[in-house]
Each structure stands twice: as structure tokens, then as C-alpha cells.
From Swiss-Prot:
HAMAP family according to UniProt: tRNA_modifying_YgfZ
Gene3D superfamilies per record: 2.40.30.160, 3.30.70.1630, Aminomethyltransferase beta-barrel domains (3.30.70.1400)
Organism listed in the record: Hamiltonella defensa subsp. Acyrthosiphon pisum (strain 5AT)
Subcellular compartments: Cytoplasm
One GO cellular component, as annotated: cytoplasm
A GO term, aspect molecular function: folic acid binding
Protein family (similarity comment): Belongs to the tRNA-modifying YgfZ family.
Protein name: tRNA-modifying protein YgfZ
Key words of the record: Cytoplasm, Folate-binding, tRNA processing
Signal peptide span: none
Binding site for folate: W28, W191
Entry annotated with the keyword Coiled coil: no
InterPro entries from the UniProt entry: GCV_T_N, GcvT/YgfZ_C, tRNA-modifying_YgfZ, YgfZ/GcvT, YgfZ/GcvT_CS, YgfZ_barrel
Length: 336
């Protein structure tokens, strides 16, 4: 990409403070699934009811291991002449190997789309500015628009934003060149902050095979079908649901810490004069005002005003954000 040097690393901003911004999603990647059996094959692999996915939809689900634990989250949509999903770059090669395990028995090809460009567009007046760049924009009711060389995805949470998926650098470079004098250019950490704010679970390599989908907010987001047929891990996911034995949940924590914690670090909760372990960090970003956002999966047997910290950080103080994640409305998503 010609303009890659424009995307500087800066402390992130909350969605309500974000100016018009273009974000290079270098920490995400794309896997393409093509071939005659692509729908049938993915139907047996992920938590989504794949045959119900329309051309103008995208949906977040999970690919699980046989124990029902998440190998990766997948943002699934139709792309070019097949299906594709966005996942974290740290998981791309592991995910490719897992998906290919049984592909020899099906007419399907699965590959990492190495040359694909992922650009996030967010912030103030995003739709107004993009109207001058694209003939048609996606909406909340039609969240994917396809053209010959690209697909454009719409997100309504935490505020309206877009994701450009281009099969070649030229579309991304064209957009950047056109917006160079209007936009702020940021690294992928800003998109990560927006995903934390939205309650979209961030599963990286350090946390794969640790959590069931319900613990990662995917049921609330409509990312698990309980009516489709079998898929890898389905028995465990269904049994957990119907027995009500899931004891963990996804939380958005805000506060301060001596440093930005690493993915997979432990969190502790204050219990009178002491602390005990309660969960693990999925993602964390430092904001421009010096505060810290942490996405974590925690045991949910505690008061919502509890004080937490990164393990061993004596001066740290984190609390559950007062802003709730957007919850799934069954009528709005027919494919889960």
C-alpha cells in the first residue's frame, strides 16, 4: 500500500470524540472459503447458520474446537465468488490449518487472502464524506454492499462506522488519496478500541481454546445458532446453554493501571483487604486522556461496582463500564 506510512500509532479515542478517521486494520486478516461445498462445509464448522446468510449481511460468530472452546471469532460475509471471514491476524495460520483438517473430503478451497486490504472508516461525518467516494453505502438494514473489486461493511455500534474489504491495494490507495486532506489516519488499535466499546469479543492466539462462545458475549450478539445441525463443539455449547452452567461473561473495564496489560494476563478483584483472581484480559488500549480500557472475561459472581486490577498492580484500579454492550434483538438477525 502506497500510503501505509500515513497510519501512525496514536492513543485511542472514544467513539463520541473521534473525528473523521481512516484506520489500517493490520491486526486483522481475511480467510476466503470458495468451491461448490463452501456453505455446507462451513455449516459444519462454525456457530452460525451459514445457509441463511444473505448477500447483504455480515455476522460475528465463532469457530470452536471439539470441547466447545473458541478457536477464533469469525466475521462472516459473502465475498467475490465465495465466503470470507475476518479474524485476528495472530490466529490466521492456526485457523487455516484447523479449517483445512477435513476439507479433503469436500469440494472447497480455504486460503488466507494475503493481498486483501482492510480499512476502517469511522468518526464524525463518516457517512457524509463517504458518499463522495462510493456509489452506494451500506446501512443498518443492508449492512454489506458489494462491487467488483471490494465489499463495504456497515457497523452501527458503538457509532456508525464502515469496513472496506478490497482484494487489491488500488481501491485502498484510491480511497486514502481522496481522503488525505480530510481524515485523520490511525493504526488498528483505534478499531480495537471501537470493538471493545461495542462488546465484540477479541480472541487472539494467547486466549484461543479457553472460553465457550456464551462467555464471550456471542449469544447476546446473535452469534450462536441453537437450531442448526451439528458443528464442531456443538454438543458442548448446547449442553452448556440448556443446563445454564456458564459462569463467565464478557466485560468492559475502565480505569487506570501502571501499564497496558498484555493479552492473557490475569485480573484480580478486591475482596475486603485482599485480592483474588477472577478473569483474564482479552484486549486493552490506552486512551488519549491516559485512562485504560480493558476487555476481559470474568467470573460473574461479583457486585457490579467491584474494584479490579491487573494481577500484582498495587496502584491499578479498574471498574466495569457503566455503558452496557448493545444486546441482540432476535428479530434483527435471522441467521443465528
Amino acid at each position: 500500500m502506497i500510503y501505509q506510512s500515513l497510519f501512525s500509532h496514536q492513543a485511542s479515542l472514544p467513539s463520541e470524540q473521534l473525528p473523521f478517521t481512516v484506520i489500517l486494520l493490520n491486526d486483522w486478516g481475511l480467510i476466503r472459503v470458495t468451491g461448490k461445498d463452501r456453505v455446507k462445509y462451513l455449516q459444519g464448522q462454525i456457530t452460525l447458520d451459514v445457509p441463511l446468510l444473505k448477500e447483504n449481511q455480515h455476522i460475528l460468530g465463532a469457530h470452536c474446537d471439539p470441547k466447545g472452546k473458541i478457536l477464533s471469532t469469525v466475521r462472516l460475509f459473502h465475498y467475490l465468488k465465495g465466503l470470507a471471514f475476518i479474524t485476528r491476524k495472530s490466529l490466521l495460520h492456526d485457523e487455516l490449518m484447523e479449517l483445512r483438517k477435513y476439507a479433503v473430503f469436500s469440494k472447497v478451497e480455504i486460503d488466507i487472502a494475503e493481498s486483501t486490504v482492510l480499512l476502517g472508516i469511522a468518526g464524525d461525518q463518516a457517512r457524509k464524506v463517504l458518499k463522495n467516494c462510493f456509489e452506494k453505502l451500506p446501512t443498518e438494514t443492508e449492512p454489506v454492499v458489494h462491487e467488483d473489486d471490494y465489499s463495504l461493511l456497515h457497523f452501527s455500534s458503538p457509532r456508525e462506522r464502515f469496513l472496506l474489504v478490497s482484494q487489491a491495494f488500488k481501491e485502498g490507495d484510491f480511497l486514502i488519496q481522496k481522503l488525505q486532506d480530510q481524515a485523520v489516519f490511525r493504526s488498528s488499535e483505534q478499531w480495537l478500541a471501537l470493538d471493545i466499546e461495542s462488546g465484540f469479543p477479541i480472541i487472539d492466539a494467547k486466549n484461543k481454546t479457553q472460553f465457550i462462545p456464551q462467555a464471550a458475549n456471542l449469544k447476546a450478539l446473535g452469534g450462536i445458532s441453537f437450531t442448526k445441525g451439528c458443528y464442531t463443539g456443538q454438543e458442548v455449547v448446547a449442553r452448556t446453554e440448556y443446563r445454564g452452567v456458564n459462569k463467565k461473561a464478557l466485560y468492559w473495564l475502565t480505569g487506570k493501571a501502571c501499564r497496558v496489560p498484555d493479552v492473557g494476563e490475569a485480573l484480580e478483584i478486591q475482596m475486603e483487604e485482599d485480592y483474588r483472581r477472577t478473569g483474564v484480559v482479552l484486549a486493552a488500549v490506552k486512551l488519549q486522556d491516559g485512562s485504560l480500557w480493558v476487555q476481559a472475561i470474568l467470573n460473574h459472581d461479583f457486585q457490579k461496582d467491584s474494584i479490579l486490577r491487573v494481577k500484582g498492580d498495587e496502584n491499578g484500579r479498574l471498574m466495569i463500564s457503566h455503558r452496557s454492550f448493545k444486546k441482540f434483538e432476535p428479530s434483527s438477525n435471522p441467521i443465528a
